[in-house]
Regions:
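Short, Lys/Arg-enriched N-terminal segments with co-localized hydrophobic residues
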Residues: 4-28
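Domain-level recognition of nuclease-like catalytic cores that cleave nucleotide substrates
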Residues: 176-237
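Short glycine/proline-enriched coil/turn segments at helix->beta-strand junctions
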Residues: 111, 135-138, 167
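Catalytic cores of nucleic-acid endonucleases
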Residues: 144-197
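Conserved catalytic cores of phosphodiester-cleaving nucleases, focusing on short active-site segments
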Residues: 106, 131-144
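Active-site metal-binding core of divalent-cation-utilizing nuclease and nuclease-like domains
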Residues: 115-134
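Interdomain/boundary linker segments immediately adjacent to catalytic/signaling cores
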Residues: 22-110
Length: 237
């Protein structure tokens, strides 16, 4: 069981330092419980989608002919298809879960903050830009991972950041896992420079986890590790 003494969290906001220990501990336990329930919801949906997709794949194996031409047996082809489709669903739901769990941490500690759309004052497409969590002047974007290799992504993000700063907000990008492909990494490096150029903030990898901990007082990574350990231990019983 984790208990946080706010005065011992380096860099934690002044607002959080003023919270009595028992009140903050109650907030922490409430967040952990909500994240557990959120994980239950995503787990159920994920496994349901995977089961449905496997059923659909059994009804369409005609393309195995091409696999066999390329030296892949029917059995190998089936496993490859299953893992590929399972991976797609897992990636999708893992990302959505982490982003929603992060938002839970923010909203529980800063209930006045919320998801917000602001008009695009620099163009017609898109008409609006969404801010994942707007708290005061902090415009926080939450990404579990951004693996895009599309150069247009930089142009769109540049416009988005300029619109946000023009509205009087500070753009803050939080991305927990860095992409692996060279082109995607290059794009992230460009985005980091972009945020720095407008006095915004860019956090990726370990820095993203630390930012959430400093901003909310909640060690989200530790919460997730606790839940993962509890579920792994339960599955091994």
């Amino acid at each position: 069981m984790l208990f946080f003494v706010l005065l011992h969290i380096e860099g934690v906001s002044a607002k959080l330092r003023k919270l009595p220990y028992l009140i903050f501990n109650r907030i922490y336990m409430a967040i952990k419980d909500k994240i557990k329930k959120l994980a239950d919801k995503y787990t159920k949906t994920l496994h349901s989608q995977i089961a449905q997709r496997k059923k659909e794949m059994k009804d369409d194996t005609s393309h195995y002919l091409i696999y066999r031409v390329l030296g892949i047996s029917n059995e190998e082809g089936q496993l490859i298809d299953e893992y590929q489709n399972t991976g797609r669903f897992l990636y999708k739901y893992a990302g959505s879960f982490l982003e929603e769990a992060t938002t839970l941490c923010f909203t529980e500690v800063y209930p006045e903050g919320c998801k917000t759309k602001i008009p695009n004052t620099l163009g017609q497409k898109p008409k609006t830009f969404e801010i994942d969590f707007l708290n005061g002047t902090d415009a926080i974007e939450i990404k579990w991972r951004d693996a895009t290799t599309d150069g247009d992504h930089i142009t769109k993000e540049h416009t988005r950041v300029k619109v946000i700063t023009g509205a009087g907000f500070t753009p803050i990008r939080v991305m927990f896992y860095y992409p692996q492909r060279a082109q995607a990494i290059k794009i992230q490096e460009t985005l980091e420079t972009l945020y720095s150029g407008v006095n915004g903030e860019y956090y990726a990898g370990d820095y993203a986890w630390e930012f959430v901990k400093r901003y909310t007082g909640i060690d989200l990574k530790q919460v997730l590790e606790e839940i993962a350990y509890e579920r792994t231990a339960s599955n091994n019983d």
